[in-house]
């Protein structure tokens, strides 16, 4: 899957200004896009701001609550719930909600418009990546089965089933 934090094409449309005014109190919100193929939990992240997702194609979000982290900041995957978003639906993901890359519903992939406080998810210097901070305003927990992400420095904070969404063949 791919993610672009901010795109001028989306940032400048009238709907983006309405989103900023209606849902962000006029704060500067970047409007980006996440798309591709994904069907497994693999990781969860959180931010200190709310996130808006608009399904361009139908998708499933795997979500949990930060309050479900144990005293070692680890999460049992049994706490994760799947939420379906139909094409065109918008959801506000609160800052205390663990989330990550959407999962595709069909084999044709997913596409999602993402609204976040400007600067969120931008790269940070390697020495800043401490205490699960992975990018600007992005804290990340990798599933312990996701060895590629763990080898790149993610905290192995999710254990149990690495949930998989099986796409529908249409």
Regions found by a protein language model. Name each.
Residues 93:
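Aromatic-residue-lined binding/catalytic grooves and analogous aromatic/hydrophobic interfacial grooves
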Residues 1-87, 100-170:
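Active-site region of the double-stranded beta-helix
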């Amino acid at each position: 899957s791919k993610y672009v934090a901010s795109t001028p094409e989306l940032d400048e449309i009238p709907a983006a200004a309405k989103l900023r005014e209606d849902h962000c109190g006029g704060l500067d919100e970047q409007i980006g896009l996440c798309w591709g193929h994904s069907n497994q939990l693999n990781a969860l992240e959180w931010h200190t701001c709310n996130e808006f997702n608009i399904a361009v194609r139908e998708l499933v979000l795997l979500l949990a609550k930060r309050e479900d982290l144990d005293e070692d900041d680890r999460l049992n995957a049994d706490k994760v719930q799947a939420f379906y978003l139909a094409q065109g639906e918008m959801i506000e993901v609160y800052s205390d909600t663990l989330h990550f890359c959407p999962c595709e519903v069909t084999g044709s992939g997913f596409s999602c418009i993402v609204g976040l406080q400007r600067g969120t998810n931008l790269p940070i210097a390697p020495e800043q990546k401490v205490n699960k901070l992975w990018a600007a305003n992005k804290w990340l927990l990798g599933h312990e089965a996701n060895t590629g992400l763990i080898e790149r420095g993610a905290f192995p904070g999710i254990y149990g089933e690495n949930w998989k969404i099986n796409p529908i063949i249409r």
